[in-house]
């Protein structure tokens, strides 16, 4: 297991109370040895005007996952901040849920890179994101 902080899924989800994460319906669903996953509904909260999943909602899911994964790689007195987010959208989603899967690409002392892949309910890749974070403290 790579994580330096040991939080349960309930504890992870509690961090979202009264935030945009909760408003979008993002819920952490899996914490593995080197992976963090979350689901987000595709509904009126996350649609763009034409009834499809908004690219910004996919980006919000990615940044949520990468930032929390980055935080779990820090020690007491440290935090992470996002420095760059890149998203490539592959296919539209109009309903149901999407699942984000976050894994590390680089874990340095001062910066991290995370890959977050967003899948639809059929397991098809809908969006590929990369988040860079800086470790502070």
From Swiss-Prot:
Residues annotated as the enzyme's active site: 63 (nucleophile or proton acceptor)
Subcellular location: Cytoplasm
Record key words, sorted: Cytoplasm, Hydrolase
One term under GO cellular component: cytosol
InterPro entries per the UniProt record, alphabetical: HotDog_dom_sf, PAAI_dom, Thioesterase_EntH, Thioestr_dom
UniProt binding sites for substrate: 48, 54-55, 82, 89-92
UniProt effect for mutating residue 63 to A/D/Q: Loss of activity
This enzyme's EC code(s): 3.1.2.-
GO BP terms, alphabetized: enterobactin biosynthetic process
Pathway in which this enzyme or protein is active: Siderophore biosynthesis; enterobactin biosynthesis
Domain of life: Bacteria
Inducing stimuli: Induced by iron starvation.
GO molecular function: 1,4-dihydroxy-2-naphthoyl-CoA thioesterase activity; acyl-CoA hydrolase activity; hydrolase activity, acting on ester bonds; identical protein binding; thiolester hydrolase activity
SUPFAM superfamilies associated with the record: Thioesterase/thiol ester dehydrase-isomerase
Pfam family, one: 4HBT
Subunit details: Homotetramer. Dimer of dimers. Interacts specifically with the aryl carrier protein (ArCP) domain of EntB.
Function noted in UniProt: Required for optimal enterobactin synthesis. Acts as a proofreading enzyme that prevents EntB misacylation by hydrolyzing the thioester bound existing between EntB and wrongly charged molecules. Displays esterase activity toward a wide range of substrates, including acyl-CoAs and aryl-CoAs.
Sequence similarity: Belongs to the thioesterase PaaI family.
Database matches in PANTHER family: 1,4-DIHYDROXY-2-NAPHTHOYL-COA THIOESTERASE 1, PROOFREADING THIOESTERASE ENTH
The protein, known as: Proofreading thioesterase EntH
Species in which this protein is naturally found: Escherichia coli (strain K12)
Primary gene name: entH
